[in-house]
């Protein structure tokens, strides 16, 4: 977009507290922009004529001192510098270099409604020119005087003395808490708040005491950030902490390790189940006795322990029992495999194959049982018939 170098210099200020733009078009024939001769239309000139913006929400009053003060405060200078968009070099050139500021403000983008939001250029030009002139005069006078620091502090106090009733609650505009900006401004800790960390009981090595100390530290930090400290809650907190400290001193924690025998099974060893079959019941009985002894020993040792050590012991005992159960199940499958003729010589037979062959073997054995029972019945009847005939022959 070509820029018009012969355009009139307009020094716009970006402080919206001094002027609030409202877009209402009472007169439709009135042009929105004051066109210069030979100046192309702005990018959003045709767009904004199709809309009608609602008024902006109420803004908080300016907390800077009045423009009639002879020397601007530190907050005033920081606010003025933050008004200009750009880095430090651009800000310095806008404030101090008149030629650069004129060339910068001649841009039509700065005058565009989408960028600056100005609807009354004449009023804004007047307000901004008066403010810049007063600020430049104040800076010249402040550079000649020797009491600039005192005046700055006075201006800062005047800035902070604005009544709070004229301000808008920041939580309405900014729903999220600004914790980073409020941390440097927290008040000095009172004697009650400084003595709070000293009353915390020493760390006893348990997770409950460490969590209590962390929560107490967080509560202490929150109390230091607050301007008013509730004396009642502080006294209650002290009494609770003292009672906790006495309880910990009266019942000291005794940490003792109980060794648990873990029998690791060698899964790579060759399964020699035929020789171990007579001793399977004895191994099961001894393993159950050993597990019961370990559980009772763990219960005796776990009475003075903390919750973490109890959980570890329970987990370790569960792992031992689970490992023994798996070993017993494996030995049972090996014993069943040796009984079945189809898979007796197959040491790598899967458990599913062993179960299928066992089912088939049981069905065939049941059939043989029924056949043998019927044959036995036939033989019994034949025997009785022969006995009766023998008696008849003997009587005759």
Curated annotation (Swiss-Prot):
One of its GO terms (biological process) is positive regulation of cell population proliferation. Residues 313-365 form the bHLH domain. It is found in: Nucleus. The gene is mycb. The keyword Transcription regulation applies. InterPro entries: bHLH_dom, HLH_DNA-bd_sf, Myc-LZ, Myc_transcription_factors, Tscrpt_reg_Myc, Tscrpt_reg_Myc_N. Residues 233-244 have a biased composition (Basic and acidic residues). GO terms for cellular component: nucleus. A motif (9aaTAD) lies at residues 79-87. Glycans are attached at residue 56. GO terms for molecular function: DNA-binding transcription factor activity, RNA polymerase II-specific; protein dimerization activity; RNA polymerase II cis-regulatory region sequence-specific DNA binding. This is Transcriptional regulator Myc-B. It comes from Danio rerio.
